[in-house]
Amino acid sequence: MSALNKKSFLTWLKEGGIYVVLLVLLAIIIFQDPTFLSLLNLSNILTQSSVRIIIALGVAGLIVTQGTDLSAGRQVGLAAVVAATLLQSMENANKVFPEMATMPIALVILIVCAIGAVIGLVNGIIIAYLNVTPFITTLGTMIIVYGINSLYYDFVGASPISGFDSGFSTFAQGFVAMGSFRLSYITFYALIAVAFVWVLWNKTRFGKNIFAIGGNPEAAKVSGVNVALNLLMIYALSGVFYAFGGLLEAGRIGSATNNLGFMYELDAIAACVVGGVSFSGGVGTVFGVVTGVIIFTVINYGLTYIGVNPYWQYIIKGGIIIFAVALDSLKYARKK
């Protein structure tokens, strides 16, 4: 192989290698069971993707700034459990707080999003003002949030929280039927989140600032960007996205436990990297995040659909994450 051809191959591998791997996996799934492409399955994939898109949008903003968040999944779980306890039906014999009326959905959204914002602010303060790395900071808050959630879960009975108010069930499980295809309400909420983040990233000074910080924090600081404040804001915003995603996930599934959200952060990070959001910072698009989530959800759903052992699924997903990050590192090695 000539030097030129070798260089072209390496360039192609860096740019599209991960998509080839994912397409091969998808082809294997379809070959094993062609019914995978049914409208019902596509509807389910889109619904599952919608919640993951909301969560991944929160993580993506952090990766753009050369950060990450290992606590995302546990924040999703905390929001799910809190929302579930506040949105149970009054007719539910196992209602956690039997004397308390079911709260309006909008109020519960505000409550869980406020909790998420506070956790995000704590992460942001530690990272921006105490200069602790995002990995260590969010690893610590992941453990703390899970502990808080488990204590609350034990306090309210330590059993799956279900029996939601009909209004909340409709809010999270409702859909628009188009023949055999069902477009869920959750997909509409995800589209709103996507539009919001697209405007934030592309049309606001804040968006320009976070990309500048990700590209070169020192240069951003010299140019007048308040790096610490912007990091604080992006981490708080990420907490809001996790919280809203957790509320929707509880409603979509129909119940919540303290283990809901386990490993969600890894799926979100993997989807972001597959979608072109670079750990080098300063690179990423909303469309890429959405694409990455959908691809990863198709693979997850497909492997389960054809009966692949869950333990093998962990191995496959872990390999995809390592491969995607390795390609990302190669792609931006010269830039670094």
From Swiss-Prot:
Part of the ABC transporter complex MglABC involved in galactose/methyl galactoside import. Probably responsible for the translocation of the substrate across the membrane. It comes from the Bacteria. InterPro entries: ABC_transp_permease. Belongs to the binding-protein-dependent transport system permease family. AraH/RbsC subfamily. Keywords: Cell inner membrane, Cell membrane, Membrane, Sugar transport, Transmembrane, Transmembrane helix, Transport. The chain crosses the membrane at residues 17-37, 53-73, 107-127, 128-148, 181-201, 227-247, 257-277, 279-299, 306-326. Signal peptide: none annotated. GO terms for molecular function: transmembrane transporter activity. It is a multi-pass membrane protein. One of its GO terms (cellular component) is plasma membrane. This is Galactose/methyl galactoside import permease protein MglC. The complex is composed of one ATP-binding protein (MglA), two transmembrane proteins (MglC) and a solute-binding protein (MglB). It is found in: Cell inner membrane. Pfam families: BPD_transp_2 (PF02653). Coiled coil: none annotated. It comes from Salmonella typhimurium (strain LT2 / SGSC1412 / ATCC 700720).
